[in-house]
Amino acid sequence: MHVDIVPVGDLPAVVKREASSGLRSVYDCEVTIHDSQPVPDGAYDSGRDQYRAEEFIELASRVGNGEKNIAITDTDLYYRRRNYVFGLAYLSGKGSVISTHRLQTSSDGGFSEKSAGDIFADRVRKEVVHEVGHTLGLEHCDNSRCVMNFSPTVREVDVKEENLCGSCQRQIL
């Protein structure tokens, strides 16, 4: 499998590096980094002061060169009635997106002894692996340690692991 990371806006090299590392580690796939793209026209909702996540998925699907493509942005994303999302993907689709905007809080609430930079890097890897998992047909998993577990807050992101549980692994083999 080939995954193309599509940076949207000015994305730090560390984010691209961590995203690539997480995907390679979990899915044993080829990963490329696409040229940076501007924020999609029409994605901004001035009433919410946020961006529509669907627009970023469409961008990744359109410009990405991979079998699976993931847009990564630092803009604040929402989807439908949700206040915000860390990421979004269509089940078995070609494109997905994650936002680092709400992953950048400095602490994991004492869950670990890691630095803020390491905590952020872990969150990026987990969310990229999670969203690409959806494009591979994986739904949310009930196992709280599985990367495919639904994580509405950074606390849940911090608690889960970067890897797929055995059940989810078997589904994509």
UniProtKB/Swiss-Prot annotation:
Residues reported in the UniProt entry to bind Zn(2+) 1: 130, 134, 140
Family annotation (InterPro entries): MetalloPept_cat_dom_sf (IPR024079), Pept_M54_archaemetzincn (IPR012962), Pept_M54_archaemetzncn_arc/bac (IPR012091)
Keywords: Hydrolase, Metal-binding, Metalloprotease, Protease, Zinc
Subunit relationships: Monomer.
Active site per UniProt: 131 (proton acceptor)
Entry note: cofactor: Binds 2 Zn(2+) ions per subunit. One is catalytic, whereas the other seems to have a structural role.
An example Gene Ontology biological process: proteolysis
Cofactor(s), by name: Zn(2+)
EC number, as in UniProt: 3.4.-.-
GO molecular function list: metallopeptidase activity; zinc ion binding
Task of the protein: Probable zinc metalloprotease whose natural substrate is unknown.
Family matches, as SUPFAM superfamilies: Metalloproteases ('zincins'), catalytic domain (SSF55486)
Cross-referenced PANTHER family: ARCHAEMETZINCIN, ARCHAEMETZINCIN-2
Pfam family, one: Peptidase_M54
Name of the protein in its database record: Archaemetzincin
Annotated residues for binding of Zn(2+) 2: 141, 146, 165, 168
Similarity section: Belongs to the peptidase M54 family.
